[in-house]
Amino acid sequence: MVTAGMTPRDAVRQLEARLTAAGCPDADYDAAELFRLVTGRDVRLADAPLTEVQAARLESLCLRREAREPLQYLCGHWSFLDFELIVGPGVLCPRADTEVVAETAAQTLAGVKAPRVLDLCAGTGCLGLGVKRFCPAAQVTC
């Protein structure tokens, strides 16, 4: 259990152990991200012990992640290419491999004079937004 007074490193180690036991595939990353979300600091740069409020929030978020709620939902936003997307339940989470799809689509459209892109039923609309970022002349509908 994460408690007030824990050092940042001990708290993150505790989170990582619990998330690993729960079968979360990237427990080390998730633990560090949850810590950053709650404290606003990278664990490598933090030295102040956890406050009661921080410990309670970390504990709550860890329980939700242990129940396999996506990290993206816990954060409420997620990076995709060079922008942030708001995410939550009911929205497919943008993933790094989806960035490759957006980049490949943009490369494919590079020679097209007035490309038209339709992004339907793929989650946040991140594919269409990503193509638009690379091909500003594209007419994109999400």
Model feature map: region roles:
Residues 19, 23-26, 66, 113, ...:
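Short coil/turn residues that cap or connect secondary-structure elements
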Residues 35-107:
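Conserved AdoMet
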Residues 2-54, 58:
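A short N-terminal interaction module
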Residues 12, 31, 58, 68-71, ...:
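A general structural signal for well-ordered alpha-helical segments in protein cores
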Residues 99-142:
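Conserved SAM/SAH cofactor-binding pocket of Class I
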